[in-house]
C-alpha cells in the first residue's frame, strides 16, 4: 500500500463515521458482550485482524507502550525463523513509516498513524493545508494510543477531542486502524462503548463516576496521603488544576476554549533558550498554511501535529489537544500525544520550562503561570503517583 491508496481507502468510510459522530446516542449496551468484541478480531466486518485490544492492551492499562510493541516485534521475528508466514496484527502496513515494513515510529515510540480530513468552509475551500502538498484533502499525523480507563466521564474522545461518543470513537478506530470493509451493527458499537465505560483506574474513581452520573455530590477520590503527598496535592491545586480542574480533573478553570490546550508539545525542538529534560517530539515538523479572515496571503506555521486545528482550521487552535484526566496516571507512561515524556518527572519539568517560556513571551498585562520550583517537583510527582 502507498500513501495515496491509504488516504483513498480512509475517505471511503468518512461518511459512515460522520453519521455516527453527528447523531450521538448513549444506549446502555452490554459490557459483557462488549468485552468479547473488544478483545477479539471482528470477523463480520472484514478487517485486517486487529481488535481493540491489539492497541488498547488490557494488561498494559488499555494503552500501547514502546516496550510492549518491541517485545511483540521480537517475538514475531523469532516465530518467523521457523514459520515465515507467522503474523501479528499489530504490525500492519498502515502503521509502517514506509507503508511496508519499517515500523520505526511504532517500535520506538508506540505511535500509530492517524488520518484526518482537512477542514473546509461552507464553500468547500480548505481552511488549512500542508505547504508541501497544497492539493491534499486528508493528512496523517503520528499519535499515541491513550488508555480507555475512566472514559465514562472524559468525553469528547481521542487526543484532539474529535469524537463526541464512545460509539463514534469505536467506529473511527475500526475504519482507520482495523480497516473494516463492512459497517458494524449498531449494537456492536453500543456494547463496545459499554465495556469501555466500565473500565476505571480505581474503585474510588468508579464511585466518582457513579455519583456524577446520578447527580450526587462527588465523593473524595484521594487515598490516604502522607505529608509529602499532602503537600503535593496543594501544589497540584496551585499549578495543575488550572486545566485539570473539577472532580474529573478535565475542567479548565481559565477563560480559554473548553477542554483543549496548547502545551507546546508539537514542536521538534525546545523553545529558544530552553533545555527540555526529555526528548523532543520524535516526529519531523511540517509547515502548515492557514487561511486567515482579512488576509490575502495564508499564515504559515511549523508543527509536528497541529492538533485541534486539523478539525477547525482555526490557526488559534494550532497544537491544541484535549485535556485528559490524571487518575491512574502513574500506570500510563509514556506521556503526551507523542509519547515524548517517559516519566512523570519529565512531564512536570516540561511544565516548569514551559512556564518560564510563557512568562518571557507573554504580552504586558497578560496572566502569567506560576513557576514550579525544583523542590516542589518531588511532592507534586508523589501526589500524581498516588491518585
Task: State where each predicted segment sits.
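Periplasmic c-type cytochrome electron-transfer domains
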Residues: 21-387
Amino acid at each position: 500500500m502507498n500513501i495515496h491508496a491509504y488516504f483513498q481507502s480512509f475517505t471511503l468510510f468518512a461518511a459512515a463515521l460522520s453519521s455516527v459522530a453527528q447523531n450521538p446516542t448513549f444506549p446502555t449496551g452490554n459490557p459483557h458482550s462488549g468485552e468479547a468484541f473488544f478483545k477479539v478480531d471482528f470477523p463480520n466486518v472484514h478487517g485486517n485482524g486487529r481488535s481493540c485490544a491489539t492497541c488498547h492492551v488490557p494488561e498494559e492499562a488499555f494503552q500501547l507502550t514502546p516496550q510492549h510493541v518491541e517485545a511483540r516485534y521480537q517475538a514475531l521475528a523469532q516465530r518467523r525463523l521457523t514459520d515465515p508466514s507467522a503474523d501479528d496484527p499489530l504490525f500492519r502496513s498502515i502503521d509502517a513509516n514506509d507503508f511496508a515494513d519499517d515500523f520505526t515510529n511504532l517500535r520506538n515510540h508506540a505511535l500509530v498513524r492517524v488520518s484526518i480530513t482537512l477542514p473546509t468552509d461552507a464553500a468547500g475551500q480548505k481552511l488549512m493545508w500542508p505547504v508541501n502538498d497544497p492539493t491534499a484533502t486528508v493528512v496523517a499525523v503520528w499519535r499515541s494510543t491513550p488508555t480507555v480507563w475512566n472514559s465514562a466521564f472524559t468525553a469528547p474522545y481521542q487526543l484532539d477531542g474529535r469524537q463526541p461518543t464512545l460509539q463514534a470513537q469505536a467506529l473511527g478506530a475500526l475504519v482507520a486502524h482495523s480497516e473494516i470493509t463492512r459497517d458494524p451493527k449498531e449494537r456492536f458499537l453500543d456494547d463496545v462503548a459499554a465495556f469501555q465505560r466500565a473500565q476505571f483506574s480505581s474503585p474510588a474513581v468508579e464511585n466518582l463516576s457513579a455519583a456524577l452520573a446520578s447527580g450526587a455530590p462527588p465523593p473524595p477520590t484521594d487515598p490516604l496521603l502522607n505529608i509529602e503527598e499532602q503537600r503535593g496535592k496543594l501544589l497540584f491545586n496551585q499549578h495543575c488544576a488550572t486545566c485539570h480542574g473539577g472532580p474529573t480533573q478535565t475542567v479548565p478553570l481559565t477563560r480559554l476554549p473548553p477542554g483543549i490546550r496548547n502545551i507546546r508539545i508539537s514542536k521538534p525542538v525546545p523553545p529558544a533558550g530552553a533545555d527540555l529534560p526529555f526528548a523532543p517530539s520524535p516526529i519531523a515538523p511540517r509547515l502548515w498554511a492557514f487561511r486567515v479572515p482579512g488576509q490575502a496571503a495564508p499564515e504559515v506555521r511549523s508543527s509536528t501535529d497541529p492538533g485541534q486545528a486539523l478539525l477547525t482550521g482555526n490557526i488559534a487552535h494550532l497544537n491544541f489537544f484535549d485535556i485528559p484526566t490524571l487518575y491512574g496516571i502513574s500506570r500510563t507512561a509514556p506521556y503526551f500525544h507523542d509519547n515524548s515524556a517517559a516519566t512523570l518527572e519529565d512531564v512536570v519539568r516540561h511544565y516548569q520550562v514551559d512556564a518560564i517560556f510563557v512568562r518571557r513571551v507573554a504580552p504586558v498585562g497578560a496572566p502569567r503561570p506560576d513557576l514550579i520550583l525544583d523542590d516542589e517537583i518531588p511532592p507534586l510527582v508523589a501526589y500524581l503517583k498516588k491518585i
